[in-house]
A protein has these predicted regions:
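N-terminal strand-loop-strand
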Residues: 1-51
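Active-site segment of metal-dependent pyrophosphate-handling enzymes
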Residues: 8-10, 32-36, 65-117, 129, ...
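A conserved beta-turn-beta hairpin within the catalytic core of GNAT-like acetyltransferases
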Residues: 47-49, 153, 160
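Short histidine-centered catalytic/ligand-binding loop motif
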Residues: 53-61, 160-161
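NUDIX/MutT-family hydrolases
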Residues: 105-108, 116-152, 163-170, 174, ...
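Short helix-coil junctions and helix-kink-helix linkers
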Residues: 173-182
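Long, intrinsically disordered, low-complexity Ser/Thr/Pro-rich regulatory/activation regions
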Residues: 200-241
Length: 241
């Protein structure tokens, strides 16, 4: 199809590790952390009502980062992100009908347990159970998830998913959810401490209803992205490191 003009849009793939209820036994459930992506329903044709990534057209007077932050604030009322970075460009001439639209995608992260107030047409969706999505937005989510998994290996990007202070069990659950496999808390603490990524706060968590020994609390040493080991790769248990 021939295109007489070209437009540019910015789209945000925003992840947060959120707790979901899963059945354990009849009548009993437990909270299971899992990665979610923020989606909103398109308000206009084509594919009006379809679930899609938040974003929109790039204005002539703004750069892409400014634009994506504006779109998130205006359209889904999301103003605070712990991390935002540009990902990839999707430029297939026929990716959307009508005017050719080039899309620049961004990865955004919201820490747990933040709970932004969302408009009625916007919702968190588990990445392993996504609804049918508009255009090529499903591919964009897959691309962003792969980038996040890779960066968890060689950077300190976990800071953007975790609370300010956390027990190692909480961090284990967040990393496990984001990576897609179980993570050992002791091994994770050893790796991240060796890289200077986390440090003990010297305080302990409040005891839960079940009692027991209170857990020591940790925090990330930085609240900005940095490479910690450019050749590192976290792998599922049983695979060679």
């Amino acid at each position: 199809m021939a295109h007489g003009s070209t437009a540019h849009e910015v789209l945000a793939v925003v992840f947060q590790v959120r707790e979901a209820s899963e059945p354990v036994t009849k009548g009993r459930h437990r909270a299971k952390p899992q990665p979610n992506v923020l989606l909103w329903q398109r308000a206009k044709e084509p594919q009006r009502g379809a679930w899609s990534l938040p974003g929109g057209r790039l204005r002539n007077d703004e750069d892409m980062t400014t634009s994506v932050r504006r779109q998130l604030a205006e359209k889904v009322d999301l103003k605070e992100l712990a991390h935002l970075e540009q990902l990839a460009v999707f430029s297939d001439p026929n990716r959307v009908p009508g005017t050719r639209m080039i899309a620049s995608t961004f990865l955004g992260l919201v820490p747990s347990p933040a709970s932004p107030e969302l408009p009625p047409d916007t919702r968190w969706h588990p990445v392993n159970c996504l609804p049918p999505m508009a255009f090529d937005h499903g591919q964009m989510v897959d691309n962003a998830r792969a980038r996040l998994i890779a960066k968890l290996s060689y950077t300190n990007i976990g800071f953007a998913l975790a609370p300010r202070e956390f027990a190692l069990s909480t961090l284990r659950d967040i990393y496990g959810a984001a990576l897609g496999y179980q993570v050992d808390a002791t091994n994770l603490q050893r790796v991240l401490a060796r890289r200077g990524v986390i440090t003990a706060t010297g305080t302990i968590a409040q005891s839960g209803r079940s009692g027991g020994r209170p857990a020591a609390l940790y925090r990330f040493t930085d609240a900005a992205l940095r490479v910690t080991d450019e050749f590192a790769a976290l792998r599922p248990p049983g695979l060679p490191g």
